[in-house]
Amino acid sequence: MKNFILLAVSSILLVDLLPTHFEHNVDLSRAINVNGVSFNNVDTSSLGAQQVRQSASRGRGLGEKPKEGADKEKKKEKGKEKEEEPKKPNENKLKQPNEGQPQAQGDGANAGQPQAQGDGANAGQPQAQGDGANAGQPQAQGDGANAGQPQAQGDGANAGQPQAQGDGANAGQPQAQGDGANAGQPQAQGDGANAGQPQAQGDGANAGQPQAQGDGANAGQPQAQGDGANAGQPQAQGDGANVPRQGRNGGGAPAGGNEGNKQAGKGQGQNNQGANAPNEKVVNDYLHKIRSSVTTEWTPCSVTCGNGVRIRRKAHAGNKKAEDLTMDDLEVEACVMDKCAGIFNVVSNSLGLVILLVLALFN
């Protein structure tokens, strides 16, 4: 009796190891195939990544310590080289004209003013050029008036100064008329710039004013170009044109925005029915085994682990004989069972078989 039990158990283990066709899903090739644990496929490409590089200059082998004398000599040589290197003399930087600094020269040029050009003065702006007065700038020299400065000379008026000389009026006085600008005064007329005043008319620039008309640049505005360009307004061109921010704000709409992304995820997240579609041969084999037991209910999965199929009769073939069933009379569905144990199943069965054999032989 004892030997019969041992023989029965050992035979069960052997059957479990070998591939059979008795509806037991044991594939020896799959069981032996170890996913991700293949000792035959060894990547040897990284074996030479950690080669030890010896120093050719010193020629010392691995594990040797560098000689202290050699290190000291090298340190001394490096120290001598550093001492022998002549110190580079400090180069004097070229004196550049400081923007925003007085002492600007030119016809109505106001030092430190950015790029304002025109016949009118660029009031309160650096590097303003023109024949008009430069309102609110110190020590400007030229034909334009030095606005806000006491010793301004030229044809323009000295804006805001009592001792202004030239043809222009003394800036800071109401109703001044002439070639000089009446800085800080309303209704000033003439060739000079009316610094900081609205509705100024004439050849002078209307410093910092939006409605300036004439040949003078609207001072206080960067990048003004042309006669009477409104300086400080970006891209303003023309006589007294105060045109801010024109022509370059286009292209705000993204071209072809998000088109093609509407269908980017189409087909994603869906079941991969093409890959998991049941094989016709597998279905036929399974049907041949359980043809007599197929009903309108789903049959058990054809495998005990992994991917398999299950079938059932369609409604119109419910009363049809089992021998007459075809693929058109059946509904087939893929089924997924728990993942097969693989190598662990083989090892456990092998250990069990060895134990049984030992017990059978020594008892």
From Swiss-Prot:
Q: Where is this region: Required for the binding to heparan sulfate proteoglycans (HSPGs) on the surface of host hepatocytes?
A: 80-88
Report residue spans for region: 12 X 12 AA approximate tandem repeats of N-A-G-Q-P-Q-A-Q-G-D-G-A. Answer: 98-241
Where in the sequence does UniProt note compositional bias of the Polar residues kind? 48-57
Q: What is its main location?
A: membrane
Q: Specify the propeptide location in this chain.
A: 341-363
Tell me where in or outside the cell this protein is found: Cell membrane; Cytoplasm
Q: Where is the TSP type-1 domain?
A: 289-341
Q: Which cysteines are joined by disulfide bonds?
A: 301-335, 305-340
Start-end of Low complexity biased regions: 260-277
Show the GO cellular component annotation of the record.
cell surface; cytoplasm; plasma membrane; side of membrane
Region: Disordered; residue ranges are 48-278
User: Whereabouts are the sequence repeats?
Assistant: 98-109, 110-121, 122-133, 134-145, 146-157, 158-169, 170-181, 182-193, 194-205, 206-217, 218-229, 230-241
The membrane topology term of the UniProt record is: Lipid-anchor; GPI-anchor
Q: Which residues form the signal peptide?
A: 1-22
Q: How is it modified after translation?
A: During host cell invasion, proteolytically cleaved at the cell membrane in the region I by a papain-like cysteine protease of parasite origin. Cleavage is triggered by the sporozoite contact with highly sulfated heparan sulfate proteoglycans (HSPGs) present on the host hepatocyte cell surface. Cleavage exposes the TSP type-1 (TSR) domain and is required for productive invasion of host hepatocytes but not for adhesion to the host cell membrane. Cleavage is dispensable for sporozoite development in the oocyst, motility and for traversal of host and vector cells.
Let me see what the UniProt entry remarks about domains. The N-terminus is involved in the initial binding to heparan sulfate proteoglycans (HSPGs) on the surface of host hepatocytes. The N-terminus masks the TSP type-1 (TSR) domain which maintains the sporozoites in a migratory state, enabling them to complete their journey to the salivary gland in the mosquito vector and then to the host liver. The unmasking of the TSP type-1 (TSR) domain when the sporozoite interacts with the host hepatocyte also protects sporozoites from host antibodies. The TSP type-1 (TSR) domain is required for sporozoite development and invasion. CSP has two conformational states, an adhesive conformation in which the TSP type-1 (TSR) domain is exposed and a nonadhesive conformation in which the TSR is masked by the N-terminus. TSR-exposed conformation occurs during sporozoite development in the oocyst in the mosquito vector and during host hepatocyte invasion. TSR-masked conformation occurs during sporozoite migration through the hemolymph to salivary glands in the mosquito vector and in the host dermis.
Q: Which family does it belong to?
A: Belongs to the plasmodium circumsporozoite protein family.
Protein name as it appears in the record: Circumsporozoite protein
Q: Which organism is it from?
A: Plasmodium knowlesi (strain H)
Name of the coding gene: CSP
